[in-house]
Amino acid sequence: MYQDKILVRQLGLQPYEAISQAMHNFTDMRDENSHDEIWLVEHYPVFTQGQAGKAEHILMPGDIPVVQSDRGGQVTYHGPGQQVMYVLLNLKRRKLGVRDLVTLLEQTVVNTLAEMGIEAHPRADAPGVYVGEKKICSLGLRIRRGCSFHGLALNVNMDLSPFLRINPCGYAGMEMAKITQWKEDATTDNIAPRLLANILALLNNPPYEYIAT
């Protein structure tokens, strides 16, 4: 894999649409010499509808806005207490295929949860990471000009009830889970560094630098 410095941005709690636009701008403007970046963020409550999304999977959004997204997949929910990690990687330069990246992201979460004694696994029929039959992490990516954006959303200590207003990722009755069901002291503040360390390990430990925002 190509070795270079990865820039890491810890963005805190942000509106989904502003971060989505920033990802598009970054991807459109980057060139072959641009550093890859990883963005760690939480979002204000929002349902995002992926490219494959069908309106009937949004059951009763109520007061939570619904935003169209160009990531892969169907509808999901983002809210405070969910750690989102966006991966802005030059896949061509890192010699990664799209399937490779999906597997890498799933393994990042599996390894992170294993450190806390939580046994999790991906599913071939439904992308994401699961504990038993319950989904704890959602994935959605977009590739443009050989570069990835969007990423994963790991449920840490969030309110899961808004997921009842949708068919998560297009699956009616899909049960959702969060880390605090097994590890009560988990927060996004202590999960984000673990996620970052695990994805960097799977990328062969490139140097990285936190960028102030």
Swiss-Prot record:
Membrane-spanning ranges: none
Q: Which EC number(s) does the record attach to this protein? A: 2.3.1.181
Q: Which UniProt keywords apply?
A: Acyltransferase, Cytoplasm, Transferase
Q: Which reaction is recorded as catalysed by this protein?
A: octanoyl-[ACP] + L-lysyl-[protein] = N(6)-octanoyl-L-lysyl-[protein] + holo-[ACP] + H(+)
Q: Name one GO cellular component term.
A: cytoplasm
What is the superkingdom listed in this entry's lineage? Bacteria
Q: Its pathway?
A: Protein modification; protein lipoylation via endogenous pathway; protein N(6)-(lipoyl)lysine from octanoyl-[acyl-carrier-protein]: step 1/2
A Pfam family cross-referenced in the UniProt record is: LplA-B_cat
Q: Where is the active site?
A: C169
HAMAP family, A to Z: LipB (MF_00013)
Q: What additional remark is attached to this entry? A: In the reaction, the free carboxyl group of octanoic acid is attached via an amide linkage to the epsilon-amino group of a specific lysine residue of lipoyl domains of lipoate-dependent enzymes.
Q: Which family does it belong to?
A: Belongs to the LipB family.
* Protein name per UniProt: Octanoyltransferase
Q: Which organism is it from?
A: Salmonella typhi
